[in-house]
């Protein structure tokens, strides 16, 4: 142990004396007696155990049930607690957040701090958790060696006692705090006590957009090391220019007593051995004594050494092919006997920025990334391996190759799993000061320098051996100050093998190797003062800008969102220096809570009585809290797919397939193709898809099509499926797809239904109140006053619970609401524009209603105007045509005042009395899709249960639309035309009124929305209007047609 690391226990002051110092309000005090950062240690005592990653008996988990007492402030904790548990103590699981176990409340905020902003001071009422745990050590742990305790994550600051004696203090919630317990331990029972503070000055550096919770939320473990032991290991790989050979570079430092550290004869008696294994094969091995080459005029290091092992033709690590070796680093004594060994998974890979491109192993990589918070709806920020694996497998299955640890270092196991399964990682320091004014305030304050620097340097020291980490990040949304420049230089000096990114200060400062904006748009400038966000196509062409551009956050997936995502990917593929980005974000950060009836529901900001709060802004995920996919996850999967397709010729039918894989052959994929007419296959085939990386190949599907007769469009569908299962996917997993509408000339189309009839089955009846059309067992009744079709009777039973009428509104999306809330109105938000224009308060008036009898049909014409504040805003004309087959065709023409903003929709709605189990349609599906989010949807014949037509967004909104539909069948109802539709047990009005999904109640019958036109959902961000111009409804005139029939009456 070095002199700096030695712990000399002194008489322990009383708890009240320690707390009197208020270390948690001093930014220059971040720890007492905490050991230096290093990669995870396990101290194996057998080489084969280290090689095989066998659980080490030298590391013991202390997870489980701990004793817990809660206080509203630290000063209320009695001094005697450090010696023994208090009578009111309860059992608390570790790891966990105490707010999820009945103590205190979770608080959700985005930008604003949850406490008054007065750094470094925090509230006097500072919730405090007092934990204790008893354990018994192995006798040999007491006799010799060093016993450490490791806290992988404690929020936000804590003091530690062992057997009544004070050990130390630490803050930084997201990196390990490790202490030497050796001087405090005894034979038999030992008791540790941990006092955890909810708020500390460190909380000002942890203003991330997440739930603010407290406690010991990651693993706690004991580690036993020999007296002489490995204290740091740094592993890096260096590849030759042609990648045919490599060097494994290992720096190992040893803890040696101070008296011996400058005695070369003593230190050279110890040797470091490095073995490189590939499965059970020893690839390379090297052994050498401690000691380095001279460093400067004062000599060399005696307590460390540097080893370099040459490897010929190494397997290269990438997210596509995560080839891992096992490096075992051993400390040997003078007799060549093993003292201890540490071991790490190692990947040979090179990360470099060359000619403006981020390259992995010499290839420019396209980042298919997502931001991920550590979040679980039941356990909060305590994440286990099962949850981590679930996320990784889902990401891989949906064509993600990268993840940004937003916005803090993750649990150590996360990186091992990313190494193993193959994900590129941006490792981000636990720094965010978003609520500061200005954000850079603390980054320019010298008193906060050590607090900033430890969060960056300790992250690098812990995680730098992982091949999955390709980029370091200095943190998030903390402005750009002198501290950032200093820490950028420190990383570049200490780890020149990886680039550094940092978005603060405008995304293109001197503290970043990558231009990494958040929410910059493809073609639209956002000229904010001081930190403009240029259109990304423009940004890479700015003078003196030669860096790659990778969006650190984009495509804000809040609720029903993600419109325009495909535009980003068109740009990424078109401009080489636009190298992708990280979607915001992975999972809806909702917590499970029980309602007054004991039923669980997903809660968001404010549901726990937390104030301040930012409502549902915590729910921006591609997946629900339980990891069920949002529809937008499929859009991401399709846009990011590794195979691209183009149609070369239709006669013969030839397609071209391009592989975007950089390193792997597509030798586990089959391509399936199918020609469909009205959703039914008329010709299909398949063949192996064995493409080299970055290669393109043409495939001839068929020389000619068979004679095809029938109504509808002809579609060519292709999809790529994996043949064998992989570590992250089952066999037959679909990884890419596309479709084309084939020219009509390839199909012989049958004629539609004829209007001719041999008998007249239609009757028209008019009186002062109604107009009624009758056809056999059904009749339609119009109200003369309202002009609306208010009854559609079949066999004497009315099938309409509400009249069929115009529909111009939708239950507002999060993107429609923007930042508006009761106390803060954003006049630019769509919902506020609609309110101001009176769209929600339109008064309908019927101008005319009249009927005409034609030779084979009855025609009814109705005109309506919609007014607000005595101003006419909309004029609609409905032309109903009833034919001899009992069909009702409606032609709708809508005229819109030029003063109105874009409407949410132009369509019709009604409440049907029927409830059927399934919905069938010919159009885009199977999942929800919208005009600006339909790349992943395919045109075919689909069938789904009614309940699955509703997307259960936690904050209810417009949902469930299916676009470009030509046929809809719901029980006896059948509609044809060209329209979008949504069908649900919930009305638009109920969706607008409900604050949570679990509050929705199924209504009578079924609500049916038929849209001729629907505005896009947007999604570049959620706080400014982001629907692109071509997806707005800004025309003055809209027209559409729908044909209805009730089939069992014909």
Curated annotation (Swiss-Prot):
<dbReference type="InterPro" id="IPR014718">
    <property type="entry name" value="GH-type_carb-bd"/>
</dbReference>
<feature type="site" description="Transition state stabilizer">
    <location>
        <position position="373"/>
    </location>
</feature>
<keyword id="KW-0460">Magnesium</keyword>
<feature type="binding site">
    <location>
        <begin position="553"/>
        <end position="556"/>
    </location>
    <ligand>
        <name>substrate</name>
    </ligand>
</feature>
<dbReference type="InterPro" id="IPR023933">
    <property type="entry name" value="Glyco_hydro_2_beta_Galsidase"/>
</dbReference>
<dbReference type="InterPro" id="IPR036156">
    <property type="entry name" value="Beta-gal/glucu_dom_sf"/>
</dbReference>
<feature type="binding site">
    <location>
        <position position="477"/>
    </location>
    <ligand>
        <name>substrate</name>
    </ligand>
</feature>
<dbReference type="GO" id="GO:0004565">
    <property type="term" value="F:beta-galactosidase activity"/>
</dbReference>
<dbReference type="GO" id="GO:0005990">
    <property type="term" value="P:lactose catabolic process"/>
</dbReference>
<feature type="binding site">
    <location>
        <position position="477"/>
    </location>
    <ligand>
        <name>Mg(2+) 1</name>
    </ligand>
</feature>
<dbReference type="Pfam" id="PF02837">
    <property type="entry name" value="Glyco_hydro_2_N"/>
</dbReference>
<feature type="binding site">
    <location>
        <position position="620"/>
    </location>
    <ligand>
        <name>Na(+)</name>
    </ligand>
</feature>
<dbReference type="InterPro" id="IPR006102">
    <property type="entry name" value="Glyco_hydro_2_Ig-like"/>
</dbReference>
<dbReference type="InterPro" id="IPR017853">
    <property type="entry name" value="Glycoside_hydrolase_SF"/>
</dbReference>
<dbReference type="InterPro" id="IPR013783">
    <property type="entry name" value="Ig-like_fold"/>
</dbReference>
<keyword id="KW-0915">Sodium</keyword>
<protein>
    <recommendedName>
        <fullName>Beta-galactosidase</fullName>
        <ecNumber>3.2.1.23</ecNumber>
    </recommendedName>
</protein>
<dbReference type="GO" id="GO:0009341">
    <property type="term" value="C:beta-galactosidase complex"/>
</dbReference>
<keyword id="KW-0479">Metal-binding</keyword>
<feature type="binding site">
    <location>
        <position position="209"/>
    </location>
    <ligand>
        <name>Na(+)</name>
    </ligand>
</feature>
<comment type="subunit">
    <text>Homotetramer.</text>
</comment>
<dbReference type="GO" id="GO:0000287">
    <property type="term" value="F:magnesium ion binding"/>
</dbReference>
<feature type="binding site">
    <location>
        <position position="432"/>
    </location>
    <ligand>
        <name>Mg(2+) 1</name>
    </ligand>
</feature>
<keyword id="KW-0326">Glycosidase</keyword>
<dbReference type="GO" id="GO:0030246">
    <property type="term" value="F:carbohydrate binding"/>
</dbReference>
<dbReference type="InterPro" id="IPR023232">
    <property type="entry name" value="Glyco_hydro_2_AS"/>
</dbReference>
<dbReference type="InterPro" id="IPR023230">
    <property type="entry name" value="Glyco_hydro_2_CS"/>
</dbReference>
<dbReference type="InterPro" id="IPR011013">
    <property type="entry name" value="Gal_mutarotase_sf_dom"/>
</dbReference>
<feature type="binding site">
    <location>
        <position position="110"/>
    </location>
    <ligand>
        <name>substrate</name>
    </ligand>
</feature>
<dbReference type="InterPro" id="IPR006104">
    <property type="entry name" value="Glyco_hydro_2_N"/>
</dbReference>
<dbReference type="Pfam" id="PF02836">
    <property type="entry name" value="Glyco_hydro_2_C"/>
</dbReference>
<feature type="binding site">
    <location>
        <position position="209"/>
    </location>
    <ligand>
        <name>substrate</name>
    </ligand>
</feature>
<feature type="binding site">
    <location>
        <position position="617"/>
    </location>
    <ligand>
        <name>Na(+)</name>
    </ligand>
</feature>
<feature type="binding site">
    <location>
        <position position="620"/>
    </location>
    <ligand>
        <name>substrate</name>
    </ligand>
</feature>
<dbReference type="InterPro" id="IPR032312">
    <property type="entry name" value="LacZ_4"/>
</dbReference>
<feature type="active site" description="Nucleophile">
    <location>
        <position position="553"/>
    </location>
</feature>
<dbReference type="InterPro" id="IPR006101">
    <property type="entry name" value="Glyco_hydro_2"/>
</dbReference>
<dbReference type="InterPro" id="IPR050347">
    <property type="entry name" value="Bact_Beta-galactosidase"/>
</dbReference>
<feature type="site" description="Transition state stabilizer">
    <location>
        <position position="407"/>
    </location>
</feature>
<dbReference type="InterPro" id="IPR006103">
    <property type="entry name" value="Glyco_hydro_2_cat"/>
</dbReference>
<dbReference type="Pfam" id="PF00703">
    <property type="entry name" value="Glyco_hydro_2"/>
</dbReference>
<dbReference type="InterPro" id="IPR004199">
    <property type="entry name" value="B-gal_small/dom_5"/>
</dbReference>
